[in-house]
Amino acid sequence: LAIDPANTAARMTLLGEAVRQEDYKEIMNLCEAGVESNPDMLEFYFYLAIAYNQAERTDDALAICQKALSHVKDDSKKEVVSDFYAIIGDAYHTKNLHAEAYAAYDSALVYNPSNIGALNNYAYYLSVERRDLDKAEEMSYKTVKAEPNNSTYLDTYAWILFVKGNYAEARLYIDEAIKNDKDSSDVVLEHCGDIYYMTGDAEGALKYWKQAWDKGNRSDTLKQKIQKKKYISDETKPAE
């Protein structure tokens, strides 16, 4: 590569190895040079965006995806274009630019209606804002059908059902989420507690809230739930 930076085959081989080893610094080095020497190779932009995300360089991830989209051609893989829009959606959401995020997810789903990651994140963020819940449920259900053992997707679907007031059904899915991930995150554990409380199991709720606390969740709302032994709503946005 030092002699011939445009040697795509060599760069792709090295990139494959770096991706396998999750060496994000090396991925950045290879892809930053790759987008210069092969500006039409969308793979370099894609892995560079992922590496920037890992490094929490949100603005750089956003910029490289937008640059990639300017190199999209008629014969570019629609799934790859969709992934760029999904990463843009995630980046905008990180920056609290929700309208821009949702527009990007919409674009992602135009290019690939089965983009599972975009469907899940879009659905979950809508549920957190308590808006467009029917749309959120529909999108989330597709992810659960596609990957019925994925605890992240099961949690999203359970949470949407909870927000809609379908507590008994929500409990079925949150139980599956917990069952499929022995090391559940504090968010999933807190969701589980909330759902258990609303299905009349205050004791089970308290158990899961305490587990969420032990996992490092230090939110005031969770603290109050544990102290008062009851569900307290943490609405980030009123229902629309």
Labelled PLM ranges:
Residues 3, 37, 71, 75-77, ...:
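Structural marker of alpha-solenoid helical repeat scaffolds
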Residues 19, 53, 86, 93, ...:
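Position-specific recognition of the canonical hydrophobic site in helix A of tetratricopeptide repeat
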Residues 13-14, 47, 87, 121, ...:
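Canonical tetratricopeptide repeat
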Residues 7, 16, 41, 50, 75, 81, 90, 124-125, ...:
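Residue-level recognition of tetratricopeptide repeat
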